[in-house]
Curated annotation (Swiss-Prot):
Recorded GO CC terms: nucleus
PANTHER family: HEAT SHOCK FACTOR PROTEIN 1, HEAT SHOCK TRANSCRIPTION FACTOR
Recorded coiled-coil stretches: none
InterPro entries associated with the record: HSF_DNA-bd, Vert_HSTF_C, WH-like_DNA-bd_sf, WH_DNA-bd_sf
Organism of this sequence: Xenopus laevis (African clawed frog)
Residue ranges of the TM segments: none
Keyword list, A-Z: Activator, DNA-binding, Nucleus, Phosphoprotein, Stress response, Transcription, Transcription regulation
Signal peptide region: none
Homology family: Belongs to the HSF family.
This protein's name: Heat shock factor protein
Pfam family, one: HSF_DNA-bind
Positions of the DNA-binding region: 12-117
SUBUNIT field: Homotrimer.
Gene responsible for this protein: hsf1
Post-translational note: Exhibits temperature-dependent phosphorylation.
Length: 451
């Protein structure tokens, strides 16, 4: 028997033909033979089989290669129960089986095919798919990397812009604080400038009607008529609500005056036109007395020149010039001692001609009921000094008004420009103290009106 012979079919692989011959050879039955059923074959003593039989039919004597080829053609190793135990079998027996490898049916060998390496193909396909996926993934990663770099650049730029904005905000806050301080100092400067030139209690010039002076004063901006009188104890004024004659002089607002008539009427001007009465609380200054001034009546000895004494002297002079003495007045002067003048003196703030007409209308010649007094010796000099003082105050007020209206303040503009400079340092201004500007007028007497 030719050990290298092949089976009749040409489609049978050489390994299967050699295997069929090897199993059919009775000389090799001690090492390889069919099973009793004829559907498998047994290999005994693999070491001796590899040394003595394999070199005769194959080009190698490696049992592992022989088993690998069997597995390649679909042969499976049959495992018996006794072989799976812990006790090693006495005989080395390995059984291989294939559905088309049956004793006496050599024609079935054509159906035995070598296994196609589907796993390798599948693996190659999978590898190719994986490579495509990896390539796509790599491209996506690169795209994401580029986007990430762009985002990182934008974030870095935004970070720098944010830092710049914070620095600008800090600078703007400092500038805002600086401007607030500058504005506050400017306001303090303007307020102190205005307060230093302010005169308390002087709102308008008040002309005095003393004697028959030929020099008139300009009418005030807001003219209003007032009447000054002493309130007798026996007379009650329901308008004012004060009946005490010792309350001092009362300034009443003359809102209505009777119209002038050709013939003088007997002095009903006070009763015909009731006027609101204003109580004056005076805190007079102590003027210097003239050595030529004669002593006053006993009632006014304690006060050198009080407001009531000064007004009584003015009223006395007015009554003396308007109402000359008569027989009736002489009789009254003989029977009664001198009393304070109780007539109404019109201290109006209009022109002298209008004042004289009002006085003539209020004090006609036929209505004098009180005798005249002797004029104090130093009255003319006091009146002249008072007129000069009033004119001086009027001139100062006009000058101040022109100064304020003309806006002719001399302000150093360089200091202001330095204040608004972008530098952070704030120059110190030596501004006048607002409280010290009022120190000069703190000693001025204040007349408080209690209505």
């Amino acid at each position: 028997m030719d050990p290298h012979g092949t089976c009749g079919g040409s489609n049978v692989p050489a390994f299967l033909a050699k295997l069929w011959t090897l199993v059919e050879d009775p000389d090799t039955d001690p090492l390889i033979c069919w099973s009793p059923e004829g559907n498998s074959f047994h290999v005994f003593d693999q070491g001796q089989f590899a040394k003595e039989v394999l070199p005769k039919y194959f080009k190698h004597n490696n049992m592992a290669s022989f088993v690998r080829q069997l597995n390649m053609y679909g042969f499976r190793k049959v495992v018996h129960i006794e072989q799976g135990g812990l006790v090693k079998p006495e005989r080395d027996d390995t059984e291989f089986q294939h559905p088309y490898f049956i004793r006496g049916q050599e024609q079935l060998l054509e159906n035995i095919k070598r296994k196609v390496n589907t796993m390798s193909a599948t693996k190659s396909d999978e590898v190719k798919v994986r490579q495509d996926s990896v390539g796509k993934l790599i491209s996506d990663v690169q795209s994401m990397k580029g986007k990430q770099e762009s985002i990182d650049g934008r974030l870095l730029s935004m970070k720098h812009e944010n830092e710049a904005l914070w620095r600008e905000v800090a600078s703007l806050r400092q500038k805002h604080t600086q401007q607030q301080k500058v504005v506050n100092k400017l306001i303090q400067f303007l307020v102190s400038l205005v307060q230093s030139n302010r005169i308390l209690g002087v709102k308008r010039k008040i002309p005095l009607m003393l004697n028959d002076s030929s020099t008139g004063h300009s009418p005030p901006k807001y003219s209003r008529q007032y009447s000054l009188e002493h309130v007798p104890s026996s007379t009650s004024y329901p308008v004012s609500g004060f009946t005490d004659s010792s309350a001092g002089p009362i300034i009443s607002d003359v809102t209505e005056l009777p119209e002038s008539s050709p013939s003088p009427s007997p002095c009903p001007s006070l009763e015909a036109s009731p006027s609101p009465v204003i109580l004056i609380k005076t805190e007079p200054l102590t003027p210097s007395q003239s050595p030529e001034q004669s002593p006053a009546p006993p009632k006014l000895d304690d006060t050198p020149i009080s407001p009531s004494t000064f007004i009584d002297s003015i009223l006395l002079e007015t009554e003396t010039s308007v109402c000359p003495g008569g027989n009736k007045n002489d009789e009254m002067s003989e029977s009664h001692p001198p009393e304070p003048c109780l007539s109404v003196a019109c201290l109006d703030n209009i022109s002298l001609s209008r004042q004289m007409s009002e006085v003539s209308r209020l004090f006609p010649t036929s209505c004098s009921s009180v005798p005249g007094r002797a004029e104090p010796p130093g009255l003319d000099m006091a009146v002249a000094e008072l007129n000069d003082h009033v004119d001086n105050i009027d001139f100062n007020l006009d000058t101040l008004q022109n100064l304020l209206n003309g806006q002719s303040f001399s302000v150093d503009t360089s200091a202001l420009m330095d204040l608004f400079s972008p530098s952070l340092g704030i120059p110190d201004l030596s501004l006048p103290d607002p409280d010290s500007s009022l120190a000069s007028v703190s000693s001025t007497p204040i007349y408080t009106c209690v209505v």
